[in-house]
Amino acid sequence: MGLLLPRGSYVFPVLASVSAATKRRAEWSYIKINITHSYSSNDKSSEFEEDNPTQKLSPEFQKAIAHGPSLSEFIKLSNNNQSTKEDFFSSPSSVNKSGKSLRLPEWLKTEIPCGGSVARLQKQLRSLNLHTVCEEARCPNISECWTAGKSTAATATIMIMGDTCTRGCRFCSVKTSPNPPPLDPDEPVNTAEAISKWDVDYIVITSVDRDDLGDGGARHIAKTIRQIKVRKPSIIVECLVPDFRGCTDSIHTVVRASPEVYAHNIETVESLQRVVRDHRAGYIQSLRSLETAKERSNRLVSSGDADFLVVTKSSIMLGLGEKEKEVMIALKDLRQAGVDCVTIGQYVQPTKRHLKVKEYIHPDKFDYWAKIGNDLGFLYTASGPLVRSSYRAGEYYIKHIIDQRKRKNI
């Protein structure tokens, strides 16, 4: 398929300031060529990240994250003011002169969700032993998405494979453990049953990472998608999935289940990957996962095994200390990987144990990034302080895109 490639390599120093080379790269023009893969054949992001000199973490901190941080490590981190790790998680730019965290700006304050649709959905979810990423990740849009309006239905986002993740990303409040409980074999059916009872026409199925499973949970996700389609064929399914550690077979398994949208988040710019995400995640690995999903979908359509080309989607958080040039590069990299839709939102610290906010981005700047995304050729760019990867404003637009693709059979 035709994708966009930059005239340059994908190498940045980790945790370093933006170099002159990086600035030049953001301004390079892009050429269109036909490719199969736009990245190296190796699936490990460590090769990309270690070939060049980087700012090394302290030995103590490297040891602490060797197997991914646990909840207890986060607690110790927040209570140890003398540790070098504490300095790593905060900086003078993330606090005011009094030493307190940045004050939440007015544009990020939302009403506390309660009663009505929120209470009803919570009760139904608990009765079926299901979990939502809205609750686990403390999303600020839970009330808006779960409450139906005059002209819109509530949008549901279900988190499957349990509520405990094997990874410990330092922005996420989902529980972590190297040995989470086994998968519930009845979950795909229970999930489909719950969704069939809701007045929704767009459902997001997301999950925790399950590195303890051979396929990363891909077959479980695929089974869930198929069960939903059996019970409610008209519904549009978006799957927001892990990177499966770069395993192409797992990606293919999910794509073959025919979700309309295949989403995977790169989360942040390249230089902050090791700061923000678990060490098993990686910038190139995430980009390659998205590209692989689109390529597989393209082959299924070409062979007549699928009726439409999957929409691919990713998300970026701002306010973690990223540079503007780096955000521009990340958006260009997503486009060249064939990503159709992107969401850009403000990072908000979920608890004191997690990464502090370096900057609250003004809404005008999010408008700027929305224009940049549209100029780069994304089918849809949702950009705003409260926008999250499953924000419903984008979902209705994506639904329109999918309907068009199905009608045209492309």
UniProtKB/Swiss-Prot annotation:
Residues that hold [4Fe-4S] cluster 1 according to the record: 134, 139, 145, 390
Binding sites annotated in the UniProt record for [4Fe-4S] cluster 2: 165, 169, 172
Alphabetical list of InterPro entries matching this protein: Aldolase_TIM (IPR013785), Elp3/MiaA/NifB-like_rSAM (IPR006638), LIAS_N (IPR031691), Lipoyl_synth (IPR003698), rSAM (IPR007197)
Protein known as: Lipoyl synthase, mitochondrial
GO MF annotation: an example: metal ion binding
Enzyme Commission (EC) number: 2.8.1.8
Keyword Mitochondrion: yes
Cofactor info, note text: Binds 2 [4Fe-4S] clusters per subunit. One cluster is coordinated with 3 cysteines and an exchangeable S-adenosyl-L-methionine.
EC main group: transferase
Residues of the Radical SAM core domain: 148-379
SMART domains assigned: Elp3
SUPFAM superfamilies in alphabetical order: Radical SAM enzymes
Domain of life: Eukaryota
Protein's pathway: Protein modification; protein lipoylation via endogenous pathway; protein N(6)-(lipoyl)lysine from octanoyl-[acyl-carrier-protein]: step 2/2
Keywords: 4Fe-4S, Iron, Iron-sulfur, Metal-binding, Mitochondrion, S-adenosyl-L-methionine, Transferase
Cellular component terms per the entry's GO annotation: mitochondrion
Reaction equations catalysed: [[Fe-S] cluster scaffold protein carrying a second [4Fe-4S](2+) cluster] + N(6)-octanoyl-L-lysyl-[protein] + 2 oxidized [2Fe-2S]-[ferredoxin] + 2 S-adenosyl-L-methionine + 4 H(+) = [[Fe-S] cluster scaffold protein] + N(6)-[(R)-dihydrolipoyl]-L-lysyl-[protein] + 4 Fe(3+) + 2 hydrogen sulfide + 2 5'-deoxyadenosine + 2 L-methionine + 2 reduced [2Fe-2S]-[ferredoxin]
